[in-house]
Amino acid sequence: LAFFNTGRSVMFLICAICEICGSSSSFQNWTYCFTVCRFVLTQPTHLAILIHLFLTGFVLCIVFVESARGMKQKKPWAGRFSKQTAASVESFTESISFDWRLYQYDIEGSIAHAMMLARCKLITDAEKNAMVKGLKEILSEIHAGKFEFKKSLEDVHMNIESALIERIGDAGKKLHTARSRNDQVSLDLRLWTRDQTQIMTRNLSALQKELVTKAKRHLGVIMPGFTHLQHAQPVLLSHYLLAYVEMLARDRSRLQDCFVRLNKSPLGACALAGTTLLTDPLFTAKYLNFDGVCENSMDAVSDRDFCIEYAFCLSMIAMHLSRLCEEWIIWCNDEVKFIEISDAYCTGSSIMPQKKNPDVLELIRGKTGRVFGHLTSLLVLLKGLPLSYNRDMQEDKVAILDAAETVHASVSILSEVVANTSFYAERMLAASGKGFIDATALAEYLVKKGVPFRMAHEIVGNIVRECIKVHCKLVDLQLEGFKAFSSVIEKDVYEVLGVENCIKNYKSYGSTSPGLVKKRITYWEKKLNKG
């Protein structure tokens, strides 16, 4: 009974502590448990004594486990602080909700860092092996969806480091030797961006191939070329499609340039000034396939130029996609109807049964503004930051990660749309016969006859005005009608008029000449098949 009374006193003491700490959700749950315990303890039976002893031991175990867990999740910078971080601050400052996507690169960088530490005798080989094994196990767990990322640990770096320490003990605490989260996050971002440039290049290549395939299949199809959305000159549909292939080629070139500038390792810069420990940044750079090491430690941790440059590349890509989408949205219209997009890539209306909407194209066009916004966000984010690292930089990942995901999705889905779109060649040809689209060919005919171009331009303008008045095309005007405006016009004028003759007579390099377009298709087929 004495033991029982003593135990009961201890139990009530624990209850009191739990109620005082009731603001904590875990302690609050315990309070409910102890309310039940109080009731049991008021019953003077031997069963109550047994229940009391069991629950006392159980609660003490929980207290021990929770205390140990709290110690493991202690902030890495907690030594300077006398109070725990407010829950609101943890929620506001965490980045794990978005930077978890960098886990593979964080682990890759940590393995390289561990290898370097062992090479420089800053840790033992046994410690290195334990680190590498533990990091690979964590990577496997994340891939399998079994790893729990915790907001209380702020970011991807501390989540992985904490998990490593939990696995291998004190050896894990040595991983951060000669490293700061400042150079660590810069490394992660560089590794991620480096991979992204290569993935995006491949995706663009796939889109180019679809466009070239369509160009080859529709070689000979004539369509109106537009300026100011007005009929201008006839062109080949293939020539039009290859224009976007050229745009995407420049996008790929920009990505390659971006790769060259970002492919430097920041490891070794630490917080901003380097380290007094003897390390080997060249080793980690080579291990991670970088071309070299950042030459200035302050620049290494504060540089986000590569993020801005990549965001600019993404913006250019999105802009090119949006231009194509804008045109094809117009071409889907029943008044134009140059193309038919597969039902699988369109949607309908909730109220109008007949509707078939090009929503995919519209969304790509709409998402382009979002990508532009991320580029602007990065520029504004960095414009006022003093050297070196500032917490503002945490927001760079929000912008660049979303911009990349958006453009990757847009490029991929547009490749599918292109592959599943049909062209109405007859409607395109019919539209090409409107709007005096062969007028420039007539002006150049006069130039060949010795008429100065400005005079030829005026003569043809007068002829067009006359044709509008009498409701006829240029090719339908009688020879006498032409001669009324210029005596140099002969019967051979009809060899340059009409859209087919216009297309046949193009000669300049890079023009819509059928022979040149065919050669360009062959060029792109070979180039894209090489990768």
Model-derived features: positions:
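Short, low-complexity, charge-dense intrinsically disordered segments
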Residues: 1-21, 31-39, 43-71, 428
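Glycine-rich cofactor/substrate-binding loops
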Residues: 72-109, 170-171, 352-531
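A helix-coil-helix interface module used to build multimeric assemblies
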Residues: 72-274, 279-285, 292, 344-349, ...
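Amphipathic alpha-helix face/heptad-repeat signature
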Residues: 103-106, 127, 131, 196, ...
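Generic, well-ordered alpha-helical scaffold segments in large soluble proteins
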Residues: 113, 134, 138-141, 163, ...
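Short, well-ordered beta-strand elements within core beta-sheets of diverse protein domains
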Residues: 113-123, 239, 246, 308-316, ...
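Alpha-helix capping and helix-loop boundary segments enriched in small/acidic/polar residues
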Residues: 176, 181-184, 228, 232-235, ...
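Acidic, glycine-rich loop-and-beta core segments that form the ion-binding/anion-interacting portion
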Residues: 292-376, 380
